[in-house]
Amino acid sequence: MNRAADSRQGFTPKQGQYLAFIHTYTLVNGRPPAEADMIRFFRVTPPTVHQMVLSLEKAGLISRKPGVPRSIAVLLERSALPELIPRDAQPVKTTVTRY
């Protein structure tokens, strides 16, 4: 993924993947994802997903309705979003101990 191209769009590669996931999930399931759906797909912790949602909202890339579950909406055209990388092709974070 080209970091420079994504930054011109106003989001990082990681943010782009979350935006692509929200868009794709909504198309496939007919409703926006819950944070739990993003936790499972990206294999990250609840605080990680929550912080990403807050940062996407603060950047004006998504909107949410306070107190309404599954109300995330992507505010960009599909053509501005990157292709979603399949779950199995995503790198898994591990901790490496150096000796």
Regions found by a protein language model. Give the residues of each.
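Pre-recognition alpha-helix immediately N-terminal to the DNA-recognition helix
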Residues: 17-24
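Key DNA-contact positions within bacterial/archaeal DNA-binding proteins
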Residues: 47
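Short helix-capping/hinge SLiMs at alpha-helix to coil transitions
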Residues: 24-30
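A short alpha-helical element within helix-turn-helix/winged-helix DNA-binding domains
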Residues: 32-42
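Glycine-centered, phosphate/nucleic-acid-interacting loop/turn motifs that mediate DNA/RNA or nucleotide
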Residues: 60
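Short, cationic-aromatic polyanion-contact patches
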Residues: 11-15, 34, 65-88
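Long, low-complexity, charge-rich intrinsically disordered regions
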Residues: 1-3, 7, 77-99
